[in-house]
């Protein structure tokens, strides 16, 4: 009897559902996946090596470009590692601002994920809904840092600047009439904090809309329930973290288990799944957005009542004031030295991990006492998740591979780095 050979199929790297530059070599028996072999490295930019030739502060913008939909959380892990080595205390207000923007970034990431995941599976409307909300949060990024994506807002010792008193408003143009302009600017008359407060006041209704479209949708459940099941034991063995681990029923969240900044003061719950399939991971991420609203509201309330500095008073690390530089020669020299030579970090090594929207994002930093890192190692959550793809996809159809890639929430900037 003739032996039937498996059929090999290249999925990506130019595939719209490949989430970047994933090349997946699938071994198929008919339409059933026997083996999935991910090929990585197509977006490798040598970030870890580049950091060795840049001062500590010059590497902050590289962090934004790792997972380019969770920008500020990447920066957070990096500056925490530097602060551990320097042994400096970050002002309380800066810690609250960081936590607030971590949660804004988490919502940004999950909105991108829910839109793209639904689009991959075949539900287009959610993508348009999610981007409507992302636009407001992108405007918040722009208001505090001047950039919509690559913010470089977190700095060793604090944040670049305090939250501005005025939220930028849309201007009149050929494509906007007065009525449309008034509606777009109605929440922008106050400060940035007022705008964020207004956003999180109306955001729960938006999450309800996504759930109305998806959670009980018959087709959505047929495509996700029972697909890509990972047992709790295997999830731990494969190094899964974040929603991928919590979807399998393990309540591991660094914000609770190893709290950093002011997360130990925050009141929130850690959602966990039951079955460890794509549907449970979807439910976990949707609930995470609701918990981010709770955390953000607590931060907003505290920030309203407690003004103060947002940068450390350690002048080895903190730049001088703009006013001082215009009148004082010493301040100008200090500023020049800080941004050309940088600051020297004591010899030693440190590991800092943050609860990234995708999992545990860690930075292992080795310093030899110079103004540049001796070695920088990035622990990207997506790397372990992609490694589990073969096991998760075996026995499923080709169409299910798209669902599994979507549920892993993969971004190649951090995997290839």
From Swiss-Prot:
Its main location: membrane. InterPro entries: NADH_Q_OxRdtase_suD (IPR001135), NADH_UbQ_OxRdtase_49kDa_CS (IPR014029), NDH1_su_D/H (IPR022885), NiFe-Hase_large (IPR029014). Its EC number is 7.1.1.-. It is found in: Cell inner membrane. NDH-1 is composed of 14 different subunits. Subunits NuoB, C, D, E, F, and G constitute the peripheral sector of the complex. NDH-1 shuttles electrons from NADH, via FMN and iron-sulfur (Fe-S) centers, to quinones in the respiratory chain. The immediate electron acceptor for the enzyme in this species is believed to be ubiquinone. Couples the redox reaction to proton translocation (for every two electrons transferred, four hydrogen ions are translocated across the cytoplasmic membrane), and thus conserves the redox energy in a proton gradient. Keywords: Cell inner membrane, Cell membrane, Membrane, NAD, Quinone, Translocase, Transport, Ubiquinone. It is a peripheral membrane protein. This is NADH-quinone oxidoreductase subunit D. GO terms for molecular function: NAD binding; NADH:ubiquinone reductase (non-electrogenic) activity; quinone binding. The gene is nuoD. It comes from Burkholderia lata (strain ATCC 17760 / DSM 23089 / LMG 22485 / NCIMB 9086 / R18194 / 383). GO terms for cellular component: plasma membrane. Signal peptide: none annotated. It is an enzyme of class 7 (translocase).
């Amino acid at each position: 009897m003739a032996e039937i050979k498996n059929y090999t199929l290249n999925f990506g790297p130019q595939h719209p559902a490949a989430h970047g530059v994933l090349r997946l070599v699938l071994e198929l028996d008919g339409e059933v996946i026997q083996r999935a072999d991910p090929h990585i490295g197509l977006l490798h930019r040598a970030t870890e090596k580049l950091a060795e030739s840049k001062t500590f502060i010059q590497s902050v913008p590289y962090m934004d470009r790792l997972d380019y939909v969770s920008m500020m959380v990447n920066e957070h892990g990096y500056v925490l590692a530097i602060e551990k080595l320097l042994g400096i205390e970050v002002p309380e207000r800066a810690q609250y601002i960081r936590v607030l923007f971590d949660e804004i970034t988490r919502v940004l990431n999950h909105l991108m994920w829910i839109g793209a995941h639904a689009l991959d599976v075949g539900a287009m409307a959610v993508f348009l809904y999610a981007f409507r909300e992302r636009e407001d949060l992108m405007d918040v990024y722009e208001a505090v840092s001047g950039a919509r994506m690559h913010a470089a807002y977190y700095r060793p010792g604090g944040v670049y600047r305090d939250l501005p008193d005025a939220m930028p408003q849309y201007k009149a143009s050929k494509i906007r009439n007065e009525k449309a302009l008034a509606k777009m600017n109605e929440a922008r008359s106050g400060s940035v904090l007022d705008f964020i407060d207004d956003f999180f006041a109306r955001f729960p209704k938006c999450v309800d809309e996504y759930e109305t479209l998806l959670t009980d949708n018959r087709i959505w459940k047929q495509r996700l329930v029972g697909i890509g099941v990972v047992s709790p034991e295997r999830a731990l063995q494969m190094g899964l973290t974040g929603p991928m681990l919590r979807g399998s029923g393990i309540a591991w969240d660094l914000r609770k288990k190893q709290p950093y900044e002011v997360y130990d003061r925050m009141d929130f719950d850690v959602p966990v799944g039951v079955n460890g399939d794509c549907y449970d991971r979807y439910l976990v991420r949707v609930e995470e957005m609701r918990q981010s609203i709770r955390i953000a509201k607590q931060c907003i309330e505290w920030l309203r009542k407690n003004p103060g500095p947002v940068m450390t008073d350690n002048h080895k690390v903190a730049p001088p004031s703009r006013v001082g530089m215009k009148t004082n020669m010493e301040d100008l020299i200090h500023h020049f030295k800080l941004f050309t030579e940088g600051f020297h970090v004591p010899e030693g090594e440190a590991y800092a991990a943050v609860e990234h929207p995708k999992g545990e994002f860690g930075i292992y930093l080795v310093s030899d006492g110079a103004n540049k890192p001796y070695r920088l190692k990035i622990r990207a959550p997506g790397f372990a998740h992609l490694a589990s793809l073969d096991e998760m996809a075996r026995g499923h159809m080709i169409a299910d591979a798209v669902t599994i890639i979507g549920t892993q929430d993969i971004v190649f900037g951090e995997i290839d780095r």
